[in-house]
């Protein structure tokens, strides 16, 4: 007979139904998993979503697959004729078929696919699927991704140089101002919502950009009701205001971004060391000293400047001597600022539906120092 403590228990763990991995307590009564509750003692266990709470239903659902099934009738037949097989047979059959395809058509003829780890229980398996794909010799990976995933993972790769992993936790605990742009963590990621709510109680300010006043937008200091599909106009306007009024960290831009690197006026590409001299390195980008006007090389491999970087210019046009003659260039930060100025504040407001007084007045009242 099983011990009563084994039949009734509260087991700490985490929810594996998405990449958030929220801390949980599994409730077992009479040997049956009956509930999944949040675990406040866990860093991400302040709350769990409806999908997590439905875990017992998934475990005991009558249609849950418990073992491999093999089709015994042709595709298109109303009755597939599923037949239970062993794991050994399933793995051997799959491996044999993959080897046949590789022998006949090459490994590149096979594509591997995986569900998004953000909304499924595959977050622990995705890296192994990719490892199998590369060991097999195929470059073809098809994955599903939510609309928000492209901005989070791919846009950050271009902005910061590295994609943000799905299970990342922003430093909401110490943030003075939080901006949620098209993001409702009450639905998408409860751990972010609870951390943001805690930050608001501490005194942090919240700005929400969303057509709908949903979730934490109801508690925001500033809600910008952008017209759907016009976010770019609002982003240009906000950037324009911040640059023109100096509401950004100048030192951070100089030190930690490519803002000082020179952009060629003739082709819009970054100026490189190979443009300056025949023996110059293509891995070297070029900035300009604000006080002397002399070029300062940046080594992208070493991740540092090769000269004095204390007063790099972030604005203005400079003429750089090249073997082909003088070439007009401007710092990347000024290049971006100029692009933002091409649309006036009034034009941007008319496009996105957010009043210019909100973009300027309310934003300035809530900017972070």
Task: Please annotate each region the language model reported.
Residues 1-329, 334, 343-347, 355-358:
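N-terminal export/assembly segments and adjacent metallocofactor-ligating motifs
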Residues 340, 362, 366-369:
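A glycine-rich, hydrophobic/aromatic-adjacent loop/helix-cap motif
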């Amino acid at each position: 007979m099983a011990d009563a403590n084994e039949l009734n228990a509260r087991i700490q763990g985490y929810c594996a139904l998405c990449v958030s991995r929220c801390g949980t307590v599994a409730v077992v009564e009479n040997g049956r998993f009956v509930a999944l509750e949040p675990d406040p003692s866990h860093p991400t266990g302040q709350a769990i979503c409806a999908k997590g709470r439905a875990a017992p239903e998934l475990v005991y659902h009558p249609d849950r697959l418990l073992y491999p099934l093999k089709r015994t009738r042709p595709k298109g037949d109303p009755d597939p004729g599923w037949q239970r097989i062993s794991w050994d047979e399933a793995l051997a059959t799959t491996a044999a078929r993959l080897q046949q395809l590789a022998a006949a058509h090459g490994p590149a003829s096979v594509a591997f696919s995986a569900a998004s780890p953000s909304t499924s229980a595959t977050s622990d398996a995705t890296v192994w699927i990719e490892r199998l794909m590369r060991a097999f010799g195929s470059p073809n990976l098809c994955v599903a991704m939510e609309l928000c995933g492209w901005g989070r993972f791919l846009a950050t790769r271009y902005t910061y140089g590295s994609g943000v992993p799905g299970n990342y936790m922003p430093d909401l605990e110490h943030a003075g101002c939080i901006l949620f742009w098209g993001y409702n963590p009450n639905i998408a990621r409860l751990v972010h919502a609870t951390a943001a709510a805690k930050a608001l109680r501490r005194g942090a300010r919240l700005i929400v950009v969303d057509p709908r006043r949903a979730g934490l937008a109801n508690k925001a200091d500033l809600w910008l009701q952008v017209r759907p599909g016009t976010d770019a106009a609002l982003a240009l306007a906000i950037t324009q205001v911040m640059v023109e009024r100096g509401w950004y960290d100048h030192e951070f831009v100089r030190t930690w971004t490519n803002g000082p690197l020179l952009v060629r006026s003739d082709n819009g590409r970054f100026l490189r060391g190979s443009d300056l001299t025949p023996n110059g390195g293509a891995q070297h980008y070029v900035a300009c000293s604000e006080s002397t006007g002399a070029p300062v090389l940046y080594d992208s491999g070493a991740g540092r400047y090769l000269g004095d970087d204390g007063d790099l210019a972030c604005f203005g046009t400079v003429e750089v001597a090249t073997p082909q003659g003088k070439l007009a260039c401007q710092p990347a930060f000024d290049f971006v600022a100029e692009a933002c100025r091409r649309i006036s504040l009034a034009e941007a407001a008319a496009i996105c539906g957010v009043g210019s007084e909100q973009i300027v007045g309310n934003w300035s009242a809530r900017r972070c120092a």
